[in-house]
Amino acid sequence: MAMTYHLDVVSAEKHMFSGLVQKIQVTGSEGELGIFPGHAPLLTAIKPGMVRIVKQHGEEEFIYLSGGILEVQPSVVTVLADTAIRGTDLDEARALEAKRKAEEHISSSHGDVDYAQASAELAKAIAKLRVIELTRRSM
């Protein structure tokens, strides 16, 4: 049997996941992180993206995160997300529309464009689309 640890994924709205996992993959402030059993304690910010969860028996689940905090302790890992949405609950049409609007906003020639905000919105839309794609592949 594979080594495991306890994972909690919590958002402001609800408790998204709680259970034993083999590993997770998440985008931290310094890049991609793979958290395996026995990982050193860690506290870091999470960028908009996804958490890829490999459960106790090898099944995968993908959850979109709009950002948050990752805490790693010896026997428990906690993801405190600003917003968390299961891949199966994401709306592809809305994500595509958000991506289109963000791209349009960035490319507009108006002087009042807030590029940082538009880029953040684009990153969130792309992350949602990636979670949708990976969720479909794992089914």
Curated annotation (Swiss-Prot):
F-type ATPases have 2 components, CF(1) - the catalytic core - and CF(0) - the membrane proton channel. CF(1) has five subunits: alpha(3), beta(3), gamma(1), delta(1), epsilon(1). CF(0) has three main subunits: a, b and c. The gene is atpC. This is ATP synthase epsilon chain. One of its GO terms (cellular component) is plasma membrane. The keyword Magnesium does not apply. HAMAP family: ATP_synth_epsil_bac. It holds the Pfam family ATP-synt_DE. Its main location: membrane.
